[in-house]
């Protein structure tokens, strides 16, 4: 699927992220917190793979045809987690994005970044990557420039765009897009 024809869904808009000032932070239950530039990531343990995924909202009534396949290139998530040194007792890895929206929490409107999580076991799968290229081109803005999490075999919502932080923790993450929307039971 071409970059232009690959389906688009976002929950909080499309933030502008500057490649030159971009930083990815790795925090939480790690031995070494990381603060990585785009260049750091592009010079890491790079893999390339053909991966397709679809929107979790696909149906005959609401959304239809939100599916795509592309050639992705990026650094392995495992290499980043290994460099940070995930501590014993860690259970989940939370992926925070640059896109921010309003959520109502206990009757108050609060700014929250889009986020999804994976169990440690799912996060360390060798095919997971932090993608910076799509179909041989730098990752387009509308597909998550400069870095997008790619989790082959999962619905599109798990493939967090505009990634800014990876946080390792010992509890389940229960943000809106894990605990209320897109709930997996």
Map each language-model feature to its residues.
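Structured, non-membrane catalytic/scaffold regions adjacent to prosthetic-group chemistry
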Residues: 1-185
């Amino acid at each position: 699927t071409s970059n232009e024809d690959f389906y688009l869904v976002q929950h909080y808009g499309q933030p502008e992220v500057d490649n030159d000032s971009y930083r990815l932070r790795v925090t939480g239950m790690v031995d070494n917190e990381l603060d990585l530039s785009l260049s750091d990531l592009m010079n890491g343990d790079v893999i390339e793979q053909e991966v397709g995924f679809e929107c979790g909202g696909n149906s005959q009534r609401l959304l239809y045809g939100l599916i795509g396949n592309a050639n992705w290139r990026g650094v392995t998530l495992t290499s980043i987690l290994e460099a940070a040194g995930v501590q014993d007792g860690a259970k989940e890895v939370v992926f925070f994005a640059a896109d921010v929206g309003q959520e109502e929490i206990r009757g108050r409107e609060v700014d929250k970044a889009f986020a999804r999580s994976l169990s440690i076991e799912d996060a360390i799968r060798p095919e997971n990557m932090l993608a910076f290229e799509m179909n041989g081109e730098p990752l387009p803005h509308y597909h998550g420039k400069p870095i997008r999490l790619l989790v082959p075999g999962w619905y599109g919502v798990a493939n967090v765009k505009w990634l800014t932080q990876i946080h390792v923790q010992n509890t389940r993450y229960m943000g809106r897009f894990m605990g209320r929307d897109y709930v997996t039971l």
